[in-house]
Amino acid sequence: MEEKRKKIRVLVGGVFDILHVGHIHFLKQAKELGDELVVIVAHDETVRMQKRREPINPAEDRAELLRAIRYVDEVYIGTPGTIDMELVKRIDPDVIAIGPDQFFNCEKLKEELRKHGINAEVIRIPYLYKSDRAKTSKIIQRIVETFCE
């Protein structure tokens, strides 16, 4: 009898406001680290705190867009503020993938996870390419310059 292998769960988090090619490349690279990709979308309040602006799209819409991407298996909306360790525990990831532009110190995050009994590996995904086409703030800037003269 063949032993069933445990599926490797990869967790990512982010704002994912105005989806662009950089997001898709990040999600694809993260999915390649395991079998299932779970995404936690930043709560609108978290976006306001981190970005100091309103989200362009509400969290529910951002979550729905992410659910439509073939690399993504599950999507949750985070709680306002900081990382919801209880949600991370319920997801039970084997790997947490950090985006190239996310301001997390991987070692400190690993320590914080361990304090909560979460033993996931933390991996930073490198830039596939760095381009203004793959940066939400630059996309917003181009829209403003093009349509708000």
From Swiss-Prot:
Enzyme class: transferase
Keyword Isomerase set for record: no
Sorted UniProt keywords: ATP-binding, FAD, Flavoprotein, FMN, Nucleotide-binding, Nucleotidyltransferase, Transferase
GO molecular function: ATP binding; FMN adenylyltransferase activity
Known pathway: Cofactor biosynthesis; FAD biosynthesis; FAD from FMN: step 1/1
Binding site for ATP: V15, F16, H20, V21, G22, H23, D101
Alphabetized InterPro entries for the sequence: Archaeal_FAD_synthase, Cyt_trans-like, FAD_synth_RibL, Rossmann-like_a/b/a_fold
EC number(s) from the headed UniProt entry: 2.7.7.2
Subunit and partners: Homodimer.
Known function: Catalyzes the transfer of the AMP portion of ATP to flavin mononucleotide (FMN) to produce flavin adenine dinucleotide (FAD) coenzyme.
Protein name: FAD synthase
Annotated organism of origin: Thermococcus kodakarensis (strain ATCC BAA-918 / JCM 12380 / KOD1)
